[in-house]
């Protein structure tokens, strides 16, 4: 782990945000600019996962330069639901991830645009039973963040509250960012590729993945389970499967051997169909086919997350004022010329 003041190239580590199974997330400074720094653990599987994620994030990141970036700079920026990747080095690089040797050990890292907020698991500790509307909107937003993976028939397979950063907007609504894209693999590639018991959080991992079943049984519905169990935790006020002070093997056994629906314990939500959505999302079989279908089910009950009021960039006001002055100037010149023509004709 890195500590305050450590340098990774030109990046100064200022704060540890979270340690995950395959990487750690830090706040860092590049000069005077705040960024987020993700560093893979010194392991080939962890490094390859971060490299793969960096390529996907680059493909998904909005253009920051060129005509499209110039036009976008004048408009209110929508809040991203995925991290925006930045160049790994201060100079140009063909790679979107960085590689550097730190104290004799090769490390792979990526640099992300800074985002403020609290990790969802910390937020749940502060408020174990989040208002069910906000909980549903968080899950719906995370599902939409996974849309590019779903459309490519890729699985995340590592969703947990620890990889979600949540900020509160000016209206008090919770706005999440999915800070990690997971393994980004097809279900057919799952079998034997990774040690899931070591690289996944068993309390939030689909039982079929932990039970080492055949690869053909692993699909997009595995991520439905993870979002469903997070939704359950926010509604019920406690985890579906307690992981604190317990070994992974114990949690894994609880998940794979559970045969009973987990009770939400919220009678007021049953009539609206919320409990049925949760039950279907975390059922051993018969889940929603993917997270987008889960999002549709929640939207049918709660509607879509409310649009966020975003600050209008100052440069738009400057542009409008400049255009106003130019138009006024053109009008004055045109009026003066017209007046001169009329005076000359009157002579």
Predicted features and spans:
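Conserved catalytic-loop aspartate of Hanks-type protein kinases
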Residues: 223
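Conserved activation segment of eukaryotic-like protein kinases, specifically the C-terminal portion
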Residues: 194-209
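ATP-binding glycine-rich loop module of kinase domains
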Residues: 29-59
């Amino acid at each position: 782990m890195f500590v305050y003041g450590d340098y990774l190239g030109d990046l100064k580590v200022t704060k540890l945000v979270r340690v995950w199974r395959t990487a750690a997330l830090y706040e860092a400074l590049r000069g005077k600019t705040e960024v987020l720094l993700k560093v893979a653990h010194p392991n080939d599987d962890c490094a390859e996962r971060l490299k793969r994620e960096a390529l996907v994030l680059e493909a998904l990141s909005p253009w920051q330069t060129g005509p499209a970036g110039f036009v976008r700079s004048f408009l209110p920026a929508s809040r991203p639901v995925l991290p925006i990747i930045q160049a790994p080095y201060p100079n140009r690089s063909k790679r979107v991830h960085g590689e550097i040797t730190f104290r004799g050990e090769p490390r792979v890292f990526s640099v992300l645009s800074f985002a403020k907020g609290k990790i969802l698991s910390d937020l749940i500790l502060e408020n174990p039973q989040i208002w069910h509307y906000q909980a549903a909107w968080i899950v719906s937003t995370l599902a939409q963040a996974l849309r590019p993976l779903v459309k490519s028939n890729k699985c995340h397979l590592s969703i947990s509250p620890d990889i979600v950063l949540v900020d509160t907007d000016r209206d008090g609504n919770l706005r999440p960012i999915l800070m990690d894209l997971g393994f980004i693999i097809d279900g057919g590639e799952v079998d034997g590729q990774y040690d899931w018991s070591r690289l996944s959080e068993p309390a939030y991992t689909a039982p079929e993945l932990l039970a080492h079943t055949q690869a053909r049984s692993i699909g997009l519905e595995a991520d439905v389970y993870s979002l469903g169990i997070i939704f359950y935790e926010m509604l019920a006020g406690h985890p579906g499967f307690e992981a604190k002070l317990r070994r992974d093997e114990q949690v894994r056994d609880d998940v794979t051997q559970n045969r009973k629906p987990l009770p939400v314990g919220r009678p007021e939500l049953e009539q609206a169909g919320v409990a049925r959505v949760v039950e279907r999302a975390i059922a051993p079989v018969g889940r929603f086919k993917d997270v987008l279908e889960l999002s549709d089910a929640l939207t049918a009950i709660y509607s879509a997350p409310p649009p966020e009021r975003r600050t209008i960039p100052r440069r738009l006001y400057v542009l409008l004022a400049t255009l106003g002055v130019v138009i006024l100037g053109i009008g004055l010149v045109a009026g003066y010329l017209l007046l001169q023509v009329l005076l000359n004709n009157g002579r």
